[in-house]
Amino acid sequence: YTNSGNPVGAAAALAALDETNKLNLASNAKARGAELNLGLNKLKSKHRIIGDVRGKGLMAAVELVEDPETKKPASKDVVSKIYKTICDEGVLVRASGNNFIISPSLIITKDHVNKIVTAIDKGFSII
């Protein structure tokens, strides 16, 4: 392949790995991911529209439902309104059907996690 074994690409990869290790990003992702999942699960007990919260590390999904018993998916209109409110708060999530996918950067701070959870809470509060 054209760039296989290219020394410039290899040097860039090694530098990226060095920076990842220097910043201890794996440990940060584990700690912030635990905070994110805790915050999202607290929102689940507050908002009936949250049918489920799933996550591992810094990747999480929030399922939106009309009824928590039947798990009927929330309508596109409701998802869109919540999504717009979250974005207006300065937080980007990915809407995928009736799910919000949250996958922040590995360098996220505790304050950023709080901002994400607060923005999502505001989004759900409009319903």
Model-identified regions with their sequence ranges:
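Conserved N-terminal phosphate-binding loop of PLP-dependent enzymes in the Aspartate aminotransferase
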Residues: 1-127
